[in-house]
Amino acid sequence: MPSLRKRVKIQAENAEPKDECSFFSELSSGSEEDNKEDSIWEPQKKVPRNRRQPASKGSKRKQGPRAKKSSQQVDDESKDVAVKEELNSPVAIVDADLEEKSHKLQTTKTLKTAAKKQKKPVPRAKKRLKVDEETSQASPLEGGGSNVETPSTSACGNVCKKEESEDSFTFGQSPVKRIRTESCPQGRPARVPDGVSDIKEEVEMNWDVVQVLSERTNIEPWVCANIIRLFNDDNTIPFIVRYRKELINNLDADFLREVRQTLDELRDVAKKVHSRIQKIKKEGKMSECLLQALLNCKTFEELEHVSAPYKMGSKGTKAQRAKQLGLEGAAWTLLENPGQLNLLSYIKPDVKGLSELNDIETGVQHILADMIAKDKDTLDFIRGLCKHRYICIQSSLAKVSSKKVNEKEVDKFQLYQNFSCNIRTIHHHQILAINRGENLKILTVKVNISDGVKNEFCRWCIQNRWRPRGFARPELMKILHNSLDDSFKRLIVPLLCREFRAKLTSDAEKQSVMMFGQNLRQLLLTSPVPGRTLMGVDPGYKHGCKLAIISPTSQILHTDVVYLHCGQGFREAEKIKRLLLHFNCRTVVIGNGTACRETEAYFADLIMKNYFAPLDVVYCIVSEAGASIYSVSPEANKEMPGLDPNLRSAVSIARRVQDPLAELVKFDPKHIGVGMYQHDVSQTLLKATLDSVVEECVSFVGVDINICSEVLLRHIAGLNANRAKNIIEWREKNGPFINREQLKKVKGLGPKSFQQCAGFVRINQDYIRTFCSSQHTDSSGQSQETAMVTNEKLGKKKNKADATLIPNPLDQTCIHPESYDIAVRFLSFIGGTMCEIGKPEMQQKINVSLGKEGIEETAERLQTTVHTLQVIIDGLSQPKTFDIRTDFDKPDFKRSIVCLEDLQVGTVLTGKVENATLFGVFVDIGVGKAGLIPIRFITEAKLSKTKRRRSLGLGPGEKVEVKVLNVDIPRSRISLDLLRVL
């Protein structure tokens, strides 16, 4: 901190009350020699954060006579060129006369610099980056093509601001952000969308949103800036992840969601700050220092701490009541000139609070304590101090818990009844468990800050920040010591505890929601089992087991109810066998709900006896979470009218194996039932994350626009329920879509929506050819074919050129329409044709071309980025039937069953991950009870390279090989060790 500044002597003993925060910018540490000296001092002006000082009126530039034009001078328009000031650059107010005399010299030097740069251009990529409209409007030199910058008004003396090359600018204002690659260690420019302006938040604060976002998410500032711009431009996460990788440094969707959540939090804080500012202004309590303190707030806890004294209350704070008694001047005098302070002069026997000297000392103490607790430098010091000291969170059994809460509920929190852990090492699931116990009045939680923190804090305050300006009598130093102690215990410690608890809870909730999203992604991307006739079984006791047989195309073939657990098992077995043989069904899908274990044992026994011969029947267990909710929903009633809701559940269970993604998107993802503490976290955050994960999965898998359902279509990036409905109506009215461009004709689908969704909708070319050929055989002849291919009636304003629509083979790939011209040039470069898309010949030509010339050189030749070219290569080489879900695991089909009593320690088994939490992974090993792999046994070495990524960790559906560590039969608990991922 800077050295202490000496303060002006106070002539009067009863000094006028000053601004309560004006002292904050002046107090700082000082040497012992300053106490002996009593010289007059002058307060220094507070330096702004951006270090820019506006020029005074007298220093404005005087316009002299215009110089004659020459080949080395700028034309008249060049005076309007805007120069982007660099952050933290030295600032000086230029004298008007000096500036006028040196103006011509500055311009001449600038022109010479520009001329030299034109002679020695920096070799860069062939495709130059575009600057925004402000830079493009600057007039070029008459003799050259580069823009000329006028001398910066903030430059010191005759030093001219260094001119940057055109390639060094992104968005037209800030320096270009670079991405490091192996072939280009210094980084290559990240291309940005045209027309993107600088980041301007709706609500301005004293902190930079990009910098704070980077600090909280641990992501590079330039990446955060690009992400903010992309989100401000209404881009969706799937679109950004696939088609804007170069702007986000190849981050995955989980990181983008984290950035968006943090950004929303910061914006919510900013909005609440300005709302609180307006409220305080209306009450007439606003001061400049309070305004700056509010604008410095970055969290809700800081905002509440700063604005708490100004809330409407009956009594106000202790400091406010002391100020109303006129003791604020005494507090300032104690700090600035303690030798002139006489507390006896404040005694007024007839005024409560001023009648005794002890009351006056207490009032001054409260004012000083409030000043200390509101000082930014003091809070920054104590926060930094806590980062390097032992701070623990403790939980214990509440005294009244045994009287009001059930004993079974208390036993659930046995681990936390005498619990203590460092806040830097505590696990997220422990925080959520402690919070739940506290909310249920079972646990008492507190944060313990060691005494060493208090001692060092008080020592720093006395010796540095809050050191009096001059000699202070012992009784005054006692007041100051009491103020520090009171401020620390009563104000600062509660604030720190709230901040620690809020940070721990926020991080734990985010991790819990992220884990829920990862589990949901694994379920949605479970590999489908197409081409099979399936029997879905919804188990039950009294009301029987509901059966539903569906065709390979998900059509309902038969529904029935059988009573397997009511003494009629043998007779019902004949019915089941008859149904399986009649529909040639070899796969049974059993829901994991009530009576699942008994139903599984029933089918396993029949299969082991070869009862269904000649059919080789297998079965699998799937989660039926959400099936009952969906069965009574309007969507289910519309899809399966007239069918009993109980039978709809059986249909849904069967379809979850045939096409999990298409079935699971039909209901709210929070009902799927994978995750941890989902009811304890923010429901808004949970819903936003799960909806985003569903959108991500559906978009990356892609949909066939001509056959997909409305429910699936509404989850595509850029679409919603209304747009999906309009697309279906357009398809029913005009026939199938011939190419992606026709999406622009759908009502409510503007350019932005088309940009976001176009790359994720596919148009099957075989389906289009079949449709067109069917029109040839129609009795109406060629005229009807043309009418159907156009997909709309010709109006008066329609051109004949619009009547004929030509299918585009690129519409069946993941290539975005904005890259079609690059894809065509790439095909020409490798000697390929549209007919070879998705065939082995295309892959061979791509490999030969990239073998001769690497992908980076090819990207430069095509004037595009490596990421865009990679998407084009993937789209051209992937087979027409490519599905990203084929890389994920399929359901585990079984023929036999194992009991819990059969397990032995050391037995090696294979199983399927059922759920993943922050403390471990639950694995279904076929014994009716899932075993737990503690998180300490899931090491990076046991995971494959593809599973080490943050978004592809162990999740539901993963097949693993485990070893039994412990079997607790009375408690039905199984401990497992992960051997490897299958």
Curated annotation (Swiss-Prot):
The modification Phosphoserine is found at S951. SMART domains: S1, YqgFc. One of its GO terms (biological process) is nucleobase-containing compound metabolic process. Pfam families: HHH_3, HHH_9, S1, Tex_central_region, Tex_N, Tex_YqgF. It comes from the Eukaryota. It comes from Mus musculus (Mouse). One of its GO terms (molecular function) is RNA binding. Keywords: Coiled coil, Isopeptide bond, Phosphoprotein, RNA-binding, Ubl conjugation. Residues 256-283 form a coiled coil. InterPro entries: HHH_9 (IPR041692), NA-bd_OB-fold (IPR012340), Ribos_protein_bS1-like (IPR050437), RNaseH-like_sf (IPR012337), RuvA_2-like (IPR010994), S1_domain (IPR003029), S1_Tex (IPR044146), Tex-like_central_region (IPR055179). SUPFAM superfamilies: Nucleic acid-binding proteins, Ribonuclease H-like, RuvA domain 2-like, Tex N-terminal region-like. Residues 1-153 are annotated as: Disordered. Residues 906-979 form the S1 motif domain. There is a cross-link at K84, K130, K161, K162, K942 (Glycyl lysine isopeptide (Lys-Gly) (interchain with G-Cter in SUMO2)). Disulfide bonds: none annotated. Residues 46-69, 114-129 have a biased composition (Basic residues). This is S1 RNA-binding domain-containing protein 1.
